[in-house]
């Protein structure tokens, strides 16, 4: 492997164990790719689509990754005119059944950290856009749009589409504080229709005399502690597993798609999730073929915090193994281990690295196997996590009580200036920070990093089995 993939300047090295970097792509040099999706054409070509909602541009980045050693950047695909829709971003997307579905937001990303009521009258899109990839995967064809009904809000965040007629959304909804679960029928993609929804009882503002809320308010810690859907609402059969921030894990029954019902709940606060972290309960991932759900508490990017500024202890943000053989009694059975610190790493651990105090360290996004996406790895004995500053971590979960980390990759720090950052204007350290990961059916792993491009890796050594 060429040295260029280990370093981006003197003293700016990456760290790797049981993995090999096949390639790196900066795309067009404009950073901002966040959630990624793969699509495999009938001819066997692999395309990577990345939602971008920060840096210098919004929309979707498109690359061909058929040859993992030579990815080809195709284009930056703009969904809406940024001059007409200056606050509209595309933080998330899903691809299945030849359709690309994009989350539209006017309050996600850095904007969610500050109050935005003065922007509420600006033209925006908040919902989902639907495109066809079948005709030309390099030029998505617009089919339709569905609006969530809450202007200048987060709109839609991380969601699930596994093919078929239903899209499962984490979504804003009028009269509800925070995002709820909404189900949209796209049988006619030109005219999407909502067919069902579910919410935590405390979210229904109109159910309380005199209660009001502001959908444009900043996502301060007090809001993050509340029960609201981060997503995705992860569907397996007639059950849905929901990471619901302060409320923890919800298990829902959607045998009747028009009337989701709560089956079980497991709360993880106050023991887990730190005061300054992101989504208190972020992801709920059911492992293929097993009665197990992997649940995460989101950490946070250290660059949001001035060095030495955090004085109070931060509770553990971690990855948890939950047994759901009885959906009414989801049970915590094991904790994932702390990420291995490389021997030559310049900091003693990931909690204090480069921050001079304990930061809200923790995991972020997981690889999400879905049976409607046959081009993805579907293993139920492996978990892949982009762990913010701890990089990509791969776990062997064949024994759910004895979880083993088997590989990692921490990229070099990005070379972008603070002004070029995905999240510009924040005072903290700009370490390498992995955001999302996806694994294809050939075993190639793709990760993207904050203020950087994407890496394609493959397992080696003990991880290659």
Segments and roles (model prediction):
Residues 1-465:
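Feature marking well-ordered beta-strand scaffolds used for ligand recognition
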């Amino acid at each position: 492997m060429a040295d260029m993939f280990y370093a981006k300047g003197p003293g700016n090295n990456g760290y790797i164990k049981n993995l090999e970097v096949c390639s790196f792509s900066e795309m067009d040099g404009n950073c901002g790719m966040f959630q990624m999706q793969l699509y495999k054409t009938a001819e066997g070509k692999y395309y990577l689509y990345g939602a971008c909602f920060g840096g210098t541009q919004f929309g979707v980045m498109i690359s061909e990754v058929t040859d993992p050693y030579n990815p080809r950047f195709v284009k930056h695909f703009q969904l809406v005119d940024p001059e007409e829709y200056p606050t509209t971003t595309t933080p998330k997307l899903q691809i299945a059944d030849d359709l690309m579905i994009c989350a539209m937001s006017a309050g996600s990303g850095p904007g969610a950290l500050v109050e935005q009521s003065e922007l509420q009258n600006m033209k925006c899109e908040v919902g989902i856009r639907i495109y066809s990839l079948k005709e030309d995967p390099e030029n998505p064809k617009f089919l339709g749009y569905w609006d969530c009904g809450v202007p200048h809000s987060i709109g839609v965040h991380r969601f699930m589409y596994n093919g078929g007629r239903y899209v499962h959304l984490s979504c804003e909804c009028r009269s509800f504080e925070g995002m709820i679960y909404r189900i949209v029928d796209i049988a006619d993609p030109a005219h999407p229709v909502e067919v069902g929804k579910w919410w935590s009882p405390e979210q229904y503002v109109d159910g309380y005399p005199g209660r009001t809320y502001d959908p444009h308010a900043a996502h301060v810690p007090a809001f993050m502690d509340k029960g609201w859907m981060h997503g995705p609402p992860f569907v397996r059969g007639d059950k849905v597993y929901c990471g619901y921030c302060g409320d923890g894990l919800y298990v829902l029954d959607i045998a009747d798609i028009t009337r989701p019902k709560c089956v079980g709940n497991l709360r993880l606060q106050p023991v887990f999730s730190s005061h300054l972290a992101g989504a208190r309960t972020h992801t709920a991932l059911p492992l293929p073929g097993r009665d197990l759900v992997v649940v995460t508490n989101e950490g946070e990017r250290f660059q949001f915090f001035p060095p030495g500024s955090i004085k109070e202890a931060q509770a553990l943000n971690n990855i948890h193994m939950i047994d759901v053989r009885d959906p009414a009694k989801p049970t915590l059975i094991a904790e994932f281990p702390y990420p291995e610190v490389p021997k030559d790493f310049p900091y003693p651990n990931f909690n204090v690295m480069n921050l001079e105090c304990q930061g809200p360290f923790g995991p972020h996004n997981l690889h999400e196997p879905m049976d409607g996406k046959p081009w993805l790895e579907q293993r139920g004995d492996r978990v892949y996590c982009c762990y913010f500053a701890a990089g990509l971590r791969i776990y062997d979960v064949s024994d759910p009580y004895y979880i083993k980390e088997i590989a990692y990759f921490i990229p070099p720090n990005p070379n972008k200036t603070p002004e070029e950052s995905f999240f510009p204007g924040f005072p903290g350290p700009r370490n390498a920070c992995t955001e999302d990961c996806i694994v294809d059916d050939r075993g190639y792993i793709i990760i993207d990093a904050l203020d950087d491009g994407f890496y394609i890796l493959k397992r080696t050594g003990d991880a290659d089995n």
